[in-house]
From Swiss-Prot:
The keyword Translocase does not apply. One of its GO terms (molecular function) is nuclease activity. Transmembrane segments: none annotated. Pfam families: RuvX. Belongs to the YqgF nuclease family. One of its GO terms (cellular component) is cytosol. This is Putative pre-16S rRNA nuclease. Could be a nuclease involved in processing of the 5'-end of pre-16S rRNA. It comes from Prochlorococcus marinus (strain MIT 9515). InterPro entries: RNaseH-like_sf, YqgF, YqgF/RNaseH-like_dom, YqgF/RNaseH-like_dom_sf. Its EC number is 3.1.-.-. GO terms for biological process: rRNA 5'-end processing. It is found in: Cytoplasm.
Amino acid sequence: MKYSKPKSKSILSLDIGTKRIGLAYCDSLFITVNILPALRREKNKNEFKTIKSHIKKLNLTGFIVGLPLDDKGRMTSQAFDCKTYGEYLFNELKLPFSFVNEHSSTWESENRFGVKKDKSGLIDSLSAKVILEQWIQEGPELKELMGNKQI
C-alpha cells in the first residue's frame, strides 16, 4: 500500500521514555520542525494536560509516537510501553496518529546536535524532532485506531 503525506496538518511528535516525554511539532506545510520542553512522565499521567494544552495552543491535528524497535524491527519492552501510551493518547484525544520506528533516534540526536549525557530532557525533545523529520521524509499518512484494529 502506498502512503501519501497528509495535507495541511500540524503534527505533534512524542519520544516516550520511562522518565520523560520529548516533544516536537511541525507546521502545516512540513517546512519547520520545532521542539517543545520535555515533560516528566507521571504515574497518574498528569503530563497529559500539558500535551493537550500544546495541541490546542498550536492547533495540532494529529500526532506520532516513536516505537523503539530493535535492530531487526522487533518490538522491545519499551516499544510495548510506547504503543500502550500512544493508544491511551488516541483514546483521550481522538486525533489521527501513527507509530514510527525510532530505532537509534537518541543516538542520532546526540551525534547530530552534540548533546550528550543530558538530564534536562533536551535530548528527548531533539529525538522527537528526529522522529518527526523521519516521518515527514517517509511520508506515511496518519491512521486512526479503531478498537484493536489499525485502519
